[in-house]
Amino acid sequence: MRIELATSPGSPERPNEDWASVALPASGQGGALIVLDGVTPPEGDYGCEHGVPWFTARLGGTLLELSVSQLDAPLTEVLATAIRRTADVHRNSCDLSHVRTPQATVVMARWGGPSQDVEHLVLSDSVLLLESPEGGVRAILDDRIDRLPRELLRTHESADRLRNAEGGFFTAAADPGVTVHAVAGRTPRERVRALAALTDGASRWVEMFEEGSWTQCLGVLRKEGAQGLIDRVRAVETAALERTTVIRWKLHDDAAVVFAEL
């Protein structure tokens, strides 16, 4: 088994709000990965005294512990429990009903021995890639936000009306009920040669800049590693800035990648 992990802040002046980790049981069989992309709130009050990095670390750590200690629980249940536990930690000090309370996108994967399935869960716009033994790559996506008309997301206020709301998009915040909206499933272990989890700061190599396909993206990870893909993203971002003086998107975003060959 080969596992690589890398993460990079979008700016040295701001804390990295992405979070990534992997757990490998002492038995030597199986494992779990968690990748979170913390949602950066606009300036102003968002009801919490802790902040997004605190939230992603709390939620991520709880997810990792539950993923390997509650093997019989489906990942949707693991996520619901982790959201509830994290909310309980600051329920008495923060306004968890605020629409901008700290929240994150989620990618989870868990695998056992050769006869067991690879389980997956994706909530919001991070991505999980599954590679078959033949080399085909399947992207597991929760594309709700991409299907929304751009004009509905043009302002923070209009996006807030769609956040964790029917007809909009969902993130892991304080309501464990959002887990019913996650994209979850199972794949026979024998049909998964490798997997990769990417926040949108890394997946923009494919989705925004169209530098390659998902299959080519996984090929970069295999040859150059997780940091190699992030380095490619940073190079493309810089080149894009040099070509134009008008940037309509965040130049550098936090990026996190986990790559695992099973």
Where are these regions (language model features)?
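PP2C/PPM-type serine/threonine phosphatase catalytic domain
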Residues: 1-262
